Amino acid sequence: MTATEQQQDDFSNVSWSEHVHDQQTRSVPDAEEPGHDMNAPGTGLERDAPSLGNEKLECTVDTPIKENDGTKDAFVSYLITTHSTFSSFQRSTTTVRRRFTDFVFLYKQLTRDYPAAAVPPLPDKQRMEYVRGDRFGSDFTTRRANSLQRFLSRLSLHPTLRRAPILHTFLESPDWNATMRSRGSRVSSASDPGSAGVFDNFADTFINAFTKLHRPDRRFLEVKEKSDKLDDDLGHIEKVIARVARREADLEVDLRDLAEQFQKLIPLEPHVEPAVHGFSASIEDTASHLRKLKDMTDQDYLGSLRDMQAYSIALKNLLKAREQKQLDYEQLTEYLNKSTTERDTLQSGHGGGSGAGSFLRAKIEDVRGVDHEQARRERTRKLELRVEELTHEVESARKTSDMFDDEVVKEVADFERIKRIEMKAQLGSLADSHIEFYGEVASIWEKYVEEMEKQGITSA
């Protein structure tokens, strides 16, 4: 990738100050040191996000355990360890176990409570492991634990979501099930009368799918384009990394097969048994370290690329929601203008009009014996009320659209900052894994050479 392409993938290049609203955006300086822990000192977080405040919130997800084993209600729980200085926490360090459905509930609550935030998504549940029945295997649970770790890390780096009361309860409460029951009942009771609203929203979405914005905001068009480019690049990198992981797995199998074949030489060549045995053991050790590298590449780094793509989609969904707010404002404005024009026409005494609709209305009024002047005054009165109501609605829609624009600008800046910190952390971990692998392999073969030299000196 050229330097120009890399620059295009950076959302920080989007100019926020040249357009319609006078938005105040947060300054997001570059993160300095490539620390590997997303919350650790050295990530540049302290200077990178002054809006986060002084409170600390660090979460780790590990140690997946299968519970209710042997029953149809078996599930996997994950250990969450939290270090926090928030006053809402009872202790500075807490540990709880949560299952995946608990994370799903938390995610749904956050998306409901913070509609103007790009809430980080959870790993997809529609995976082949559910079909094959091996969703309790260590490979799957490790991948999921890594993804859930990234989910909580993103929340802890978000200036608004990290302060969400439901998140703090999730991270500390010993009676989380009671919280889910109470919140779930409130949400269901509140949504009962609005069941028809689901169809209304669907109808709105369907209609608006064929409606274009009259004045699209160039700022958000640029963000959408850069987000699409990011998804494209991540998709290409993911394919290459997946191929690397497969080749590392194949190489591990070949190394173990090679070690086994050398072991078969020992009965045939007993006079070189120490050398062959040591060589075979060194190959086995190399294969074991290669397995660790492959697991890190496959289970952690490859998963981080997919999770970042999902996070980018969440941002684009927020852009669609912002576009909907602007569309509502434009359509209401158009309706207001139409009603105002119709009212002014009636007030000017040209209520009859020259259209086919006006002609038919006049004929119907004649048949019914309606006084045309009285009917015109009645229509004028209704239009006055409609214009007044629409004026308030348009002003409300404008304020909502402007406020949503402001929030989306902040969300894009937060996404860019979190993305940068996470990518540096993941690349740092991948680099550390390679350094450890090559260091261990070099040590293995250096020891083998030393042993062979000792045996050569002794035999001499």
Curated annotation (Swiss-Prot):
One of its GO terms (cellular component) is endosome membrane. GO terms for molecular function: phosphatidylinositol binding. Residues 238-266, 306-337, 374-403 form a coiled coil. It is a peripheral membrane protein. Residues 1-16 have a biased composition (Polar residues). It is found in: Cytoplasm; Membrane; Endosome membrane. PROSITE patterns: PX (PS50195). Its main location: cytoplasm. Belongs to the sorting nexin family. Sorting nexin involved in the separation or division of vacuoles throughout the entire life cycle of the cells. Involved in retrieval of late-Golgi SNAREs from post-Golgi endosomes to the trans-Golgi network, for cytoplasm to vacuole transport (Cvt), and autophagy of large cargos including mitophagy, pexophagy and glycophagy. Autophagy is required for proper vegetative growth, asexual/sexual reproduction, and full virulence. Autophagy is particularly involved in the biosynthesis of deoxynivalenol (DON), an important virulence determinant. This is Sorting nexin-4.
